[in-house]
Amino acid sequence: MSIIQVQNMTFAYDGSYDAIFENVSFTLDTDWKTGFIGRNGRGKTTFLKLLMGWERPISGTIAASVHFDYFPFPVEDGGQPAMEAARSMIAPFTAWERRMDELLAEGSEQALAVYGELQQRYMEADGYIIDELITREAAKLNIPEEALQRPFGTLSPGERTRLTLAALFLKKNNFLLIDEPTNHLDMEGRRLAGQYLAGKKGFILVSHDRDFLDRVVDHVISVNRADIEVQQGNYSTWKLNRDRQDQFELARNESLKRDIARLTASAERAGQWSDRVEASKIGGHTYDRGYVGHKAAKMMQRSKSIERRQLEAAEEK
């Protein structure tokens, strides 16, 4: 187990007056299956780019001891066999194999020393069994072995999506950032991918498909207008907690409004009484209208703050 630590991070794109993230801090466990939710434009894909190092924070830090990979993963040569495409997503196995053959053929002491180092890397990446592992994982996603011999570009978009997910999860010390995987999946493909991801751990998933999130994740990051929240549970758990918070704040705001009305009426009555006393020149106790008015004003500020949060919560839905 390790963690991803975001500390006091601020980020804005060049030329923008508004920060996407401002002084945010949170911690993620790399064993979590984390769903990343929030309205469009709130910075979900931007945050994945920050983790990948494709963007840099203006201030603050992101610390992690894992290697990040991003889905979708580009495959430049669609004419290569699907098996070879999957292998290349994991490690440069074919290049390593070619180089090891060259070193063995050379046979010098120096060449054999380099061969030993390269073979160790090959073994640590499961190079000797990688084809079997790819075949096994692809089968879990309903991709038959014969499809792995076809050109990658001839696979359906759904097959390419599922095979890419399978390959990336075979990488060692890898934390996967999955951006909208259901875009090219039909209902059966979503079921297969959801079932597959539910059996994995160690990823962040961005998806607008709430049912898919429910089947897959065990934690949720919520990107709100003012902050970022991390909660345990799937999307439905997060939604239930959010609705309860909204209902609590609504009830609290209604109570505040009743108190404001009571204080305002009290201040008005006291003012009328004080004015009558002053007009009749009769001395006596005076009522502090300023104090009551100040207290009512503070309550109104709290009410407005709650209403703003309620509006932001409604916009998130």
Report the location of each language-model feature.
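Flexible nucleotide-interacting loop at or near the entrance of a catalytic core
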Residues: 2, 106-107, 113-129, 144, ...
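ABC ATP-binding cassette signature C-motif
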Residues: 1-254
